[in-house]
Curated annotation (Swiss-Prot):
Pfam families: K_trans, K_trans_C. It is a multi-pass membrane protein. It catalyses: K(+)(in) + H(+)(in) = K(+)(out) + H(+)(out). Transport of potassium into the cell. Likely operates as a K(+):H(+) symporter. GO terms for molecular function: potassium ion transmembrane transporter activity; symporter activity. This is Probable potassium transport system protein Kup. Keywords: Cell membrane, Ion transport, Membrane, Potassium, Potassium transport, Symport, Transmembrane, Transmembrane helix, Transport. It is found in: Cell membrane. GO terms for cellular component: plasma membrane. Belongs to the HAK/KUP transporter (TC 2.A.72) family. The chain crosses the membrane at residues 16-36, 58-78, 100-120, 149-169, 173-193, 221-241, 253-273, 294-314, 343-363, 373-393, 399-419, 424-444. It comes from the Bacteria. The lineage of its organism: Bacteria, Bacillati, Bacillota, Bacilli, Lactobacillales. It comes from Streptococcus pyogenes serotype M12 (strain MGAS9429). InterPro entries: K+_transporter, K_trans_C, K_trans_N, Kup.
Length: 666
């Protein structure tokens, strides 16, 4: 990687600063909407809190943001970039060669990130709309929670509905809106604090530790379940690394942290000033003058939509990476924008919409949603910590130091996990069930692939080279196609899937001028696009290894077109001049892609567990995208063939011929 690229990645700019605000900080930036409300309501209301409770709560928030977000993610995780890309799957590709079991924390972390993230639009948008209860002139309408739910659902329908068209046209305003949002958080919090400067004492971690064991804290250690809401968006700082660059996050995070800490302190000051008033409004909205609340609700709604959009886009990216790493079923992916990073996965979009909408309808209020929110993300953070430990060791950190540092973060996050475990009975079970379902699908897909590689026979292509040449020259067979292309799962040392040779020679002899055997390998680098060619000493058999990054689309025909041109220009492949064509000088013949669907024909060798995995994977494949779409073959000539996936030698069944009686008497 060149120094200029590294400099650009680490360099900050004014434009990058604004862009980072709109992409990275939506989730963590909207946490002030509901974190203090959750703390106060779980304590019994505004009139049940004391100064020591408030100081302890703010101290816990400050030090949680410092330890987890600043130290772990900003100072440590951001250095673990995979060619400028971040996120749990990028981190996994950096360390997966160190141990085969690391696929487990990667799958669990990805699944919990997806499942818990499905609650983010529900919590943030509902919290913002509930602010209308504090707006004079509208409060009488929105005191009825049904109206809040209806408004929230309308916003969600529009938000998820526009995903298919791409969001680049509105993405340009995200940064400026979030800059205004964070500026408002900081300014309003600062002015609210002026009457209660004792809030600054919360910087001392003594107040945080004291509150955990204080009798004034009605929830004990379980208060950390509400505190954790302040840092649920920390994972996004790492996941969105590739979108904005490390330098812009380094510069923007201090500004963001200052603004949200000031907001929490301002809400705390308002609570101390009104703890005997009996007001039961969300401190975030109640701490602002009533004449400004309608503008604040509008701004909060925009911020909530931006946070939700970041979550949706992040989910598409996460699933896309999992598919290319072959740990998730293939779903149709489209690119509605000009940028390859702007992708859209219809199935995932509408699953997220269904989960989010059901969450709003089932929990109804943001307070009830908060009770279930954050449980799964603690698991994601633990899984990231495990992978980070291996990364530090790989980069030369002394193992004892890497173990100690990551053990500290694992302990902190495990305590948060235990504190959030109480949420399981308050709705967190729904998120856990969704996460388990995603992990199950990932496991089945990954394990099924391993079983195929374990049992399926492969053959040496060199042993059949002469047969293929005879077939190519045998005019008794009609020309099947000028170029026939097979996609192979394996092509090492001239070994190829048995099913491909079965298709060429046994299923129906396919005469062609050139036989192409293409293998797509996903690399650990995100944006690789390279290939290797082996002509096998012929001009009619071509082995192609495509090396594509885990964030690159696997549109095989587009790459193959370039490869064919390169081979013809170098003289390694004869030109295929066309007699009939509307394109003068066309020297490439027609192509047909043969896709092979392998079905288990004899599973005698499989254990019951392996048979269950293969059958389940086959069932899942019925609802996934076809390989034709995944490899970009929609506009190509494609033949789909079903061949037996022979896992063991087929046993002959005993049978006897019935001999006619008259013949036996003779």
């Amino acid at each position: 990687m060149s120094d200029s690229h590294l400099t650009a990645f680490d360099k900050a700019s004014k434009a990058g600063f604004i862009i980072a605000l709109g992409i990275v900080y939506g989730d963590i930036g909207t946490s002030p909407l509901y974190t203090m409300q959750s703390l106060v309501e779980n304590q019994g209301g505004v009139n049940q809190v004391s100064e020591s409770f408030i100081l302890g709560s703010i101290s816990l928030i400050i030090w949680t943001l410092t330890l987890i977000t600043t130290i772990k993610y900003v100072l440590i995780a951001l250095k673990a970039d995979n060619h400028h890309e971040g996120g749990i799957f990028s981190l996994f590709t950096l360390v997966r060669k160190m141990s085969p079991w690391l696929i487990v924390p990667a799958m669990i972390g990805g699944a919990t990130l997806l499942s818990d993230g499905a609650l983010t639009p529900a919590v943030t948008v509902t919290s913002a709309i509930e602010g209308l209860k504090a707006v004079p002139g509208l409060s009488h309408i929105y005191q009825n929670q049904t109206n809040v739910i209806i408004t929230t659902l309308v916003i969600l329908i529009v938000l998820f509905g526009i995903q298919r068209f791409g969001t680049g046209f509105i993405g340009k305003i995200f940064g400026p809106v979030m800059f205004i949002w964070f500026s408002f958080l900081g300014v309003s919090g600062f002015f609210n604090m002026l009457g209660h400067l004792e809030i600054f004492k919360a910087i001392n971690p003594y107040y945080a530790l004291h509150l955990l064991f204080s009798p004034e804290n009605h929830r004990g250690i379980f208060i950390l379940g509400s505190i954790f809401l302040a840092t649920t968006g920390a994972e996004a700082l790492y996941s969105d690394l590739g979108h904005v660059g490390r330098g812009n996050i380094y510069v923007s995070w201090p500004f963001v942290k200052m603004c949200i800490v000031l907001s929490y302190c301002g809400q705390a000051a308002w609570i101390l000033a009104n703890k005997h008033s009996g007001i039961e409004l969300n401190p975030f909205f109640a701490s602002v003058p009533s004449q400004l609340r309608v503008y604040l609700v509008s701004l909060a709604t925009l911020a909530a939509i931006i946070a939700s959009q970041a979550l949706i886009s992040g989910s598409f990216t996460l699933v896309s990476e999992a598919m290319r790493l072959k740990i998730f079923p293939l779903f149709r992916v489209t690119y509605p924008g000009a940028n390859l990073g702007q992708l859209y996965i219809p199935v995932i979009n509408w699953i997220l919409f269904a989960v989010t909408s059901c969450t709003v309808l089932a929990f109804r209020t943001s307070a009830h949603m908060e009770a279930a929110y954050g449980l799964a993300i603690t698991i994601t953070m633990l899984m990231t910590t495990i992978l980070l430990k291996y990364y530090l060791i790989k980069k030369g950190t002394r193992p004892i130091l890497a173990h100690l540092v990551m053990a500290f973060f694992a302990l902190v996050e495990f305590i948060f996990f235990l504190a959030s475990a109480i949420k399981f009975m308050h709705g967190g079970y729904a998120v856990v069930i969704l996460a388990l379902a995603i992990v199950f699908v990932m496991f089945i897909w990954h394990a099924g692939t391993r079983i195929v590689f374990k049992y399926v026979k492969s053959l040496n292509l060199n042993d059949y080279k002469e047969q293929i040449k005879q077939l190519r020259d045998d005019v008794c067979f009609d020309l099947y196609q000028t170029n026939v292309v097979y996609l192979s799962n394996r092509m090492q040392d001239h070994m190829i899937d048995r099913s491909i040779l079965y298709s060429i020679l046994d299923k129906r002899p396919k005469r062609a001028q050139v036989y192409w055997f293409v293998n797509v390998q996903v690399t650990d680098e995100p944006y690789t696009a390279k290939y290797k060619v082996d002509m096998m000493g012929t001009d009619y058999m071509v082995r192609v290894n495509l090396y594509l990054g885990f964030r690159m689309p696997q549109t095989v025909p587009r790459y193959l077109r370039t490869i064919v041109q390169d081979l013809m220009e170098s003289g390694r492949l004869p030109k295929q001049e066309q007699e009939y064509t509307i394109t003068p000088g066309r020297d490439v013949g027609d192509f047909r892609f043969v896709l092979i669907e392998e079905r288990v024909s004899n599973a005698r060798q499989l254990s019951n567990f392996e048979r269950f995995i293969m059958q389940t994977k086959a069932s899942i494949k019925h609802v996934t995208a076809s390989p034709m779409r995944w490899f970009g073959l929609q506009y190509s000539e494609v033949t789909l063939e079903v061949v037996p996936l022979i896992l063991s030698d087929v046993l002959k069944l005993p049978i006897k011929e019935l001999v006619p009686v008259e013949d036996s008497e003779a």
